[in-house]
Amino acid sequence: MKIQVKVKPNAKHQKIEEAEDGSLIISLKSPPVEGKANQELIKLLAQKYRVTKSQISIQSGLSSRNKLIEILD
């Protein structure tokens, strides 16, 4: 499964919202430094979809707020 994600780093609270177009808007506490926000994003998505962190990969947007995430079943 592939999903579009818009990430908002440095938020006060972690939050996952669904946009009208079906993509996810995810607020993260971590700053976008040294991959910390990406690590938190993968951990949060693994919990939401009940998969291991190794089943989630960032296909595009590694250094962008807009990302394409692939989740393997």
Curated annotation (Swiss-Prot):
Transmembrane segments: none annotated. One of its GO terms (cellular component) is cytoplasm. It holds the Pfam family DUF167. InterPro entries: DUF167, YggU-like_sf. It comes from the Bacteria. Gene3D superfamilies: YggU-like (3.30.1200.10). Belongs to the UPF0235 family. This is UPF0235 protein PCC7424_0673.
